[in-house]
Amino acid sequence: EQFHLEIQNLYAALAQPTEKLTVSYPISDGKGAEKRPSFVIGRIARLLPSISVETESVDKEYRLSARTTALEYAGEQIGGALWQYFEKQGDAKSALEAMRAASHYTRGRLSPGAVRALYGDAVTLSASRMDKARSCHFAYFMRYGLRAKERTGAGFDAPQIGTFVHDVMENTLRAAKERGGLHALSEEALHELVRASIEAYIDRVLPDLNEKSARFQYLFRRLCAAVDRIMDEVSEELKSSDFEPLAFELAFGADGQLPAITIREKNGTARVVGKVDRVDGWLHNGKLYLRVVDYKTGKKSFDLAELRYGLGLQMLLYLFTLKEEGRALFGGQEIVPAGILYTPAREPMLRCARDTAPEKIEKARKKELRRSGMVLEDPAVLQAMEHSTLTSPCYLPIAVKKDGAVTGSLASAEQLGKLSKYVDRLLHEITQEVFAGNIDADPYARTPQQSACTYCEFASACHFENGCGSDRMEYIKATKNDEFWQYIDEVNGKEARSDG
């Protein structure tokens, strides 16, 4: 009854305009997590197929429609055409003077005493902390120096969904390994293990599930069905591979299977801790080839441009650390890094016509679920990862040309060695900046509208103004494969010369 009343109210609202109707909807929430449009959007699109969907203007011209936002826009280019317009108006003198004065403002640096008071002699760095430090020094200071936190509401939010999916996948694969591996399990047997893992999660984390709202229970049931499909897909991948899961939730740190990764600088020490979702291995000719796998419930993917700027280091860091420290843990064989893979742990959203053939939908779904990452450029290793990879790869982030050449996100053993040195250099740089007291607001950005500021929880404390004082956007430039490796060679070469 309530639903029909809401539909009636919606119809009445849509029928009110006499000249123009604009319908808008968000594509992400306040934290950047993907959101699905309301079913109403789909109905409108089907009723009015000739209407195209417009995305928010990249230049945000709409800011000029109101005086307050237009003034803010003028402040981004002091002396520009819009600034000159307000100068001629004469009634914005105080605002312009304030913005000009703010352009000379600098945040400064923390004193050595303040750094010691906030961080001590050693800081703990996790994947999220490293990314925060590289994406904006001020945001890192707020979150991990002052320990400021935004208020959070109740609910089964994105991080909890990720934890649930990770938990079920880990326990299902662990149970499958104890029963002889995925090759020995039928689809029905696999689903039984999934259900057992879900029940164990409910008993441990959601014992009051039946007391939750009807909406919560519906969303949770839908999530459980999605996990079944995700596990089917992961099972298919591993059944077509010689790589086998060797470890789950492999931890680096005080209570982990491996020690924390220690970075020592003159002004302080950093200890990198974290967990690897899964480590797969292939034993060949006395060598153990390892790949590190990370489950992603969001749309995170491997990006050379981000890696160049020091974001998303953790997977490679774990891989290179396993090469140096993992020998005793995995039987004593020499370890060879074979790559890193981000595995989608979500149901993809597909844009298909209502009459699209099932086989086309499945093909589009497979494409969306292709792994991203970087793998070793070695035909034997690639074929061991996926048996059909040299003819028709389905899972790996590579492609095969008509002449049989393999392209994609590949790296030779030599290149991975160079990358290991580069990652180590970035870790030392992060450590130096933290202990130097750097609190600059210097967010990384793809565009002015797609930056570390876009969903930052500390915007109200920061008041970032690009170009004002020390505030500046650090733009991430798209990086091609050859450009990336050339850059790595240049940086490593400079470091070698300075050491010499």
What is the meaning of each model-derived region?
Residues E1-Q16, D303-L304:
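Conserved helicase C-terminal RecA-like lobe
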Residues L5, S28-G500:
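Structural signature of nuclease core domains in nucleic-acid processing machines
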Residues P17-L21, I335-A338:
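Short glycine-/polar-rich loops that comprise or flank the Walker A/P-loop
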Residues T22-P26:
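Acidic beta-strand-to-loop metal/phosphate-binding motif
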